């Protein structure tokens, strides 16, 4: 075979197991890239056209390659491996990534080479996925909502509607150190929607000390009223038990429990009265003219 023929260089490299001249590698890369691009596209077109599963073709090629031993087979094997990479990653992966595996191709089984290619393909696919998620920064600064926006922006809608609707801002909250850009009201108006508004209470000022203390005092009075009502109910139940009232639904032994409840309520009332008297003292310190009666 003529030594100037590229297939001769391929066979020499694969047979000797080492590269004597790096120039051969670049020549082979350029040659195979062009040939591969044509063959790969033709094979993909045929596969898609006849709708045959790619695994069946791969199995046939593997069985054929195992039985053959010629320089042409080595050449086809290289193209076949490149085709596997192209199918899995959807772009051409050049020899410089898997050249070590190709150099020792004669001494390696096809299953080993396929496993090697799959391993490299998985690594590169993961890198591609990570880069797809990046928005011009690091992984920590990625914006997962960008895919949602991109999908929504490509959704089908009439052209006249698309021209009338302005572009929505792509900015989404990113914390910390990011600013959220609100959507202007004119975007809502052009869609026939009412403007966004927030209803605020008419009185948003902080209450004065006197108002705050008076509110606390009113709460204490309501609590004392509730405690008084509860104490009356407990005393009524005790009276029903003592008088053997037929309408009484409680066991006679519950009388002692109700007495404990009354003691607890009286203790809570005393605490509330003590708090109320302290509040009255504070009010009188602020304004001596305040006329609040102390709790007894």
Curated annotation (Swiss-Prot):
Chief location bin: mitochondrion
GO CC term, one of those recorded: mitochondrion
Entry keywords, A to Z: Mitochondrion
Origin superkingdom: Eukaryota
Location in or out of the cell: Mitochondrion
Protein name per the record: Uncharacterized 34.3 kDa protein in ATP6 5'region
Source lineage: Eukaryota, Fungi, Dikarya, Ascomycota, Pezizomycotina
């Amino acid at each position: 075979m003529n030594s100037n023929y590229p297939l001769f260089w391929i066979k020499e490299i694969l047979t000797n197991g080492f590269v004597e001249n790096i120039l051969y590698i670049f020549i082979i890369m350029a040659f195979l890239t062009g040939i591969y691009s044509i063959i790969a596209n033709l094979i993909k077109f045929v596969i898609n056209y006849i709708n045959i599963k790619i695994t069946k073709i791969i199995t046939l090629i593997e069985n054929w390659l195992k039985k053959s031993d010629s320089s042409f087979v080595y050449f086809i094997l290289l193209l076949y491996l490149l085709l596997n990479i192209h199918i899995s990653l959807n772009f051409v992966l050049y020899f410089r990534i898997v050249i070590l595996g190709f150099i020792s191709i004669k001494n390696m089984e096809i299953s080993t080479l396929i496993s090697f290619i799959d391993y490299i393909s998985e690594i590169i696919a993961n890198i591609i996925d990570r880069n797809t998620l990046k928005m011009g920064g690091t992984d920590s600064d990625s914006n997962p909502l960008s895919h949602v926006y991109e999908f929504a922006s490509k959704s089908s809608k009439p052209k006249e509607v698309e021209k009338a609707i302005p572009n929505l801002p792509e900015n989404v909250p990113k914390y910390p150190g990011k600013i959220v850009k609100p959507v202007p009201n004119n975007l809502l108006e052009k869609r026939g929607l009412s403007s966004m508004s927030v209803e605020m209470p008419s009185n948003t000022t902080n209450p004065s000390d006197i108002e705050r203390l008076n509110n606390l005092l009113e709460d204490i009075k309501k609590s004392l009223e509730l405690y008084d009502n509860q104490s009356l109910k407990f005393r009524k139940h005790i009276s029903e038990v003592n008088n053997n009232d037929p309408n009484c639904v409680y066991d006679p032994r519950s009388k002692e429990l109700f007495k404990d409840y009354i003691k607890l309520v009286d203790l809570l009332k005393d605490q509330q009265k003590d708090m109320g008297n302290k509040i009255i003292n504070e009010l009188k310190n602020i304004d001596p003219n305040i006329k609040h009666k102390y709790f007894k």
